Amino acid sequence: MNRRAAAERQGRTGERIAAWWLRLHGWRIVGSRVKTRRGEVDLIARRGRTLAFVEVKTRGDAAGLATAIDEYRLRRVAAAAEALLPRYGVGVENVRIDVMLVRPWRRPVHLTNVWHGQ
């Protein structure tokens, strides 16, 4: 398997783990790998009247996770979330962008409300 295919497989596995983790914590997954012209959102989750657009990053080590999220990536998720809000945001009071950091054999880390725009 080439490196790109291996990275794609690792990313999909991380998204499944993140979705599982969110479900265990009371979230309902209402969308996954949703693409727009502005970008892609890995997971869209809802709990009560809160809607979270979730970026999932999967890396093999802590050092890789530490550099996986930057302003550019969050800005693209925010742009995609803005485009998707009319479709997924009916009846919600709170909208936020979260990040899930996934490493093998470790609990996922859920960072909430990481983007406040600029």
UniProtKB/Swiss-Prot annotation:
Gene Ontology molecular function, alphabetical:
nucleic acid binding
| Entry-linked Gene3D superfamilies | 3.40.1350.10
By its UniProt entry, which InterPro entries does this protein fall under? Answer: Restrct_endonuc-II-like, tRNA_endonuc-like_dom_sf, UPF0102_YraN-like
What is any Pfam family matched here?
Answer: UPF0102
Q: Which family does it belong to?
A: Belongs to the UPF0102 family.
Record's HAMAP family?
UPF0102
Q: State what protein this is by name.
A: UPF0102 protein Swit_0572
